[in-house]
Each structure stands twice: as C-alpha cells, then as structure tokens.
Amino acid sequence: MDSGAGKARSKKKTLPQEGPHPPFDISKALRLVRTLIKKYKEPVVTTYGRHKNRPAFVVLISCMLSLRTRDEQTRAASARLLARADTPRAIAALEEREIEELIYQVGFYRTKAKSIKNACQALIRDHQGHTPETMEELLKLPGVGRKTANLVITLGHGKPGICVDTHVHRILNIWGYVETKTPEATEMALRQKLPARHWIEINNLLVTFGQNLCKPVSPICSQCPLGALCPRLGVKRSR
C-alpha cells in the first residue's frame, strides 16, 4: 500500500461551514434608512395619505392606479382624476371612457377604470360613500387586494397594519429578517415579529429605499449605509 497516498489523504483539509447569520437589527436598519431617504421623493401614495380631505378615499384611488405603474405616471393620473372628481359619487357619475381618458398613462388603464368605477359604486351602495376601515370590508371592493387595503388602513385611517409590496418583500429577505416566498407570507411573518412601532412606516421606508438604492437589479451596495448590517442574501450582482 502506498503510505504517501495515505498521508496525502490524511492531510486533506475540510472547508469551514458557514454558520447561521446573527439576528438582524431591524430597528437600527430602519433608522439608517429613515435618514438616507430624506433626499429622495416619497412614494405618491404616501403623499396622498396626507390629503386633508377624505385621505382614505384618496389613498384608495391612488393605490389602485399605482399597481404595476411608475410613481411619475401614478402621480399624474391621480392628479388628473381627482381634479375632475374627488368623491365616490363624482367618480361613479363619470362614464368609464371618461375615467380611461383621465388615467391613460397608467398600466392596465382600462381594467383600472372599470375597477375604480365599480369600487366607487360599492362605496356608495354599501358604505354611504365612506371608505371602510377594516381589511374584510376593503377586500370586498373591486380591484382591491391586501397591499391596497393595508395602505388605506395605515395611511388613510392611521390604524395599525403592515403593507408589503415587492420592494418590502425583497429587501427583508435580502436582510435575512424573514425567509418567505411571497409578499403575503412576508406580511404574516412581520405581524409575528416586527415591533409595532414600525408597522405603518416600513412600507414607505423600504419602497423609497428600494426604488433609489436597493434596486431589484444590481443594487447600489457601494453607497449603502447598511453595509455592515446587511448579509446581502441572494444578491448575485451589485454596484
């Protein structure tokens, strides 16, 4: 037997295994993001959340318009529609074609025009023109999913809720704060572990952060103040 080969085998080193990541400091991360995003424009839905008159309804309409649409187009379409009609009754009185012409810049504008008109009719029929405050009632409205409902609850009514869009879902998985496959699963995980003081703000913080720095394709990690905190899970390419 070749003793040299046996010695070579005995000297073979085992590569160290990567250990578990330490708990992610979500409060510190959000504090850093909060400071960072002050120089960026906030999401249009957040802007409309400060509308002095009928904020919940304005948030509802702007969020329905925002789905799969850039903020610039959402902002312009929301302004045109709400300048023409800014109550459920006023919008319900418009022809569907009129709504289409006012919001044509947004994606799927024909589908959204139909959903918005139908939602306004439902608000009049079932809620005396008021925008509901509960997830159950909001989800009954045409064209309204959990993201829109949570934004109406948090920004429109100022009540506890967690809105999770694709940016929030993606970034929290990069941070390793959650390990989830869908935005809805992320929302449910956050309801179990995210401190309540961060519930309302997290969507605005991470959407702005995701639009400007932690981008879906090639995030700008070289300029990110979270470098020491972020494990960059799943990030294959960055700048």
Regions inferred by a protein language model and the residue ranges of each:
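Short Lys/Arg-rich cationic patches that frequently serve as NLS/NoLS or arginine-rich RNA/DNA-binding motifs
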Residues: M1-E18
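Catalytic cores of DNA base-excision repair glycosylases
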Residues: K13-R239
